[in-house]
Regions:
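Histidine-anchored, small-residue-rich loop motif
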Residues: 1-161
């Protein structure tokens, strides 16, 4: 009874059954994940399946080992979205450098970057996604050990003036 009254009152005042709230707590996928889901460990290959190309799968991005569900913004992270290049991979390096033109930047490999600056940037992005009202943490990506040379330094200015 009280829930029905609350929904009707909300609709009367805000034209929304949730008092205008549109975050993850009214997303059926998030509720299902909270009730029945569990954090998953992904390989890089498994994570690549969640790039938005299959509309039946969620869209995941990785940031230095942490994986987030960003399906709520399919128009941003989906195949035709402006940030589609982040989907289905751990692109920690691109989050740090801001260099989106070089495909080698879309990796978790932070070698060659200033470690203090890189960790601060990574923490900032992880905090953003952890605290988001529409995205949520779903697991971790377990990477193979890094081999070979690190990516070439990007000549892109991180924050142009």
């Amino acid at each position: 009874g009280i829930l029905l009254f609350n929904a009707v009152a909300s609709w009367w005042f805000t034209s929304s059954a949730t008092w205008g709230y549109t975050g993850k707590w009214v997303d059926g996928r998030f509720i299902k994940y909270q009730l029945f889901g569990q954090h998953t460990n992904f390989t890089s290959q498994e994570l690549s399946l969640y790039n938005g190309s299959d509309p039946n799968l969620p869209i995941y991005i990785g940031i230095y080992g942490r994986v987030y569900d960003v399906t709520a913004s399919r128009h941003i992270y989906g195949p035709k979205g402006p940030y589609a290049f982040f989907s289905g991979k751990d692109a920690a390096r691109a989050f740090v450098t801001g260099c989106f033109q070089n495909q080698e930047e879309f990796t978790h490999d932070l070698r060659g970057l200033n470690p203090v600056e890189a960790q601060a940037d990574i923490k900032g992005w992880q905090d953003y996604y952890d605290g988001s009202h529409k995205y949520w943490f779903v697991g971790n990506v377990i990477h193979e050990p890094l081999t070979g040379e690190p990516p070439e330094p990007c000549e892109h200015r991180k924050f142009p003036h």
